[in-house]
């Protein structure tokens, strides 16, 4: 019996939208961006912080290793997959993602 794959890499994407469009973007981002990601990443978390004039969205996806992440992004693991309507929703298009090694994980998640 093989043990389940464990994430060693976290890929963090951030984007900002106006407060007026935040609810609409949250639905769009889930349907068009997160759902497909769920099929290939080991895990996905999404976050939203509402501020006075804008809302920030953050997606953290978890990967077995850089090679697995690269199969999703192409040869460059830092490459961003802009969704077709991101220019309409986002205040500015993100230019980079953050990639971190996952050292430990504690507690229940998911």
Residue spans for each PLM region:
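Non-catalytic surface loops within mature trypsin-like serine protease
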Residues: 19, 65, 101-104
